[in-house]
């Protein structure tokens, strides 16, 4: 799954979390303390936990760089752009810049009826969300995924990466 992809890209420690299980500063401190490295880069991959990552950075004696990734695609892109031979400063600059090039979306199930952004949603519908905004709703994962990709991709897009799973 996603954890395996991140491990293959060189991640030393993954803190489990999710939309309803936000890791604490203490969780970050445990991870930091378990890593034997001169420099540690943290990719929160969730806008709700960037503050906890920054608090852990302030509490630690180690050299910590928090790259404020707000979602998994940003974390993936940052990791792909990491250069083990570059300086900490050069990596930080490159990784921060890489975040500006990422557009992300997700396809999931609606948990209730709603109307948002002129999109009528029924509980159980498949919904497409891009950059935190509801874009589409319907019955088919394939059609909603295709619609979402079409809305995200433009003439400046170079790579499309899809992750499938929970």
Protein language model regions, located:
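N-terminal loops that bind phosphate or other acidic moieties
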Residues: 1-166
């Amino acid at each position: 799954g996603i954890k395996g992809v991140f491990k293959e890209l060189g991640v030393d420690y993954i803190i489990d979390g999710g939309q309803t299980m936000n890791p604490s500063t203490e969780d970050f401190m445990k991870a930091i303390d378990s890593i034997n490295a001169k420099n540690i880069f943290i990719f929160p991959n969730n806008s709700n936990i960037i503050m906890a990552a920054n608090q852990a950075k302030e509490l630690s004696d180690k050299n910590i760089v928090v790259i404020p990734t707000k979602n998994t695609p940003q974390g993936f892109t940052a990791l792909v752009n990491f250069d083990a031979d570059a300086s900490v400063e050069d990596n930080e600059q490159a990784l921060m810049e890489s975040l500006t090039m990422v557009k992300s979306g997700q396809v999931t199930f609606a948990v209730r009826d709603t109307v948002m952004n002129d999109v009528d949603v029924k509980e159980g519908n498949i919904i497409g969300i891009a950059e935190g905004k509801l874009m589409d709703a319907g019955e088919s994962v394939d059609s909603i995924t295709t619609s979402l990709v079409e809305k995200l991709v433009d003439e400046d897009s170079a790579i499309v990466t899809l992750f499938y799973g929970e």
